[in-house]
Amino acid sequence: MSRSSDESGAATAELAMALPLLVAVTAGLVWLLAVGAAQVRVVDAARETARAAARGDGADEAVARGLQVAPEGSRVTVAVSGDRVRASAAGRVAGPGGLFDFLPAVTVHAEAVAALEAIPASGGPAGWPAGGP
C-alpha cells in the first residue's frame, strides 16, 4: 500500500504544528513546578524561623536561619506573643516569560507558630527584650 501524493509530508506538517504547543505546555508546567518548590521553601523557612525563636535563639539569628532556607529575595519576620512565636515568610516567583509573558509574578507565603520552649528570666527568648520584640 502506498500513500497518495497529496498525503506525503502530512506527518511532518502535523508535527510542526504540534511541537511548539508541546514546548509551551512543558514550559508552563516547569514554571508551575518552580512555584510549588518556592512554596515548599517558604513553608520550611517559616517553620525553621519559628523553631529557632521558640528554642530561645535571638530574633536576628532566627530570621537568618529562615533566610537560609527561603527563596532568594524573600522576607522573613518573627514575633512573640505571650507564650507563642509566630514566623512569616514570603517570596515571589517571576512569571515564566515567553508565550506566558502575560502571567504576573506569583507571591508565595507561609506562617508557622511554635510554643516557647523555655522562658528565661528576662521575660522572653534569649536575645529578645522583655515583653517581646
Regions found by a protein language model. Name each.
Residues 1-62:
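Alpha-helical assembly-interface signal, strongest on the long, hydrophobic N-terminal helix that forms
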Residues 2, 55, 59-133:
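Short, conserved structural patches
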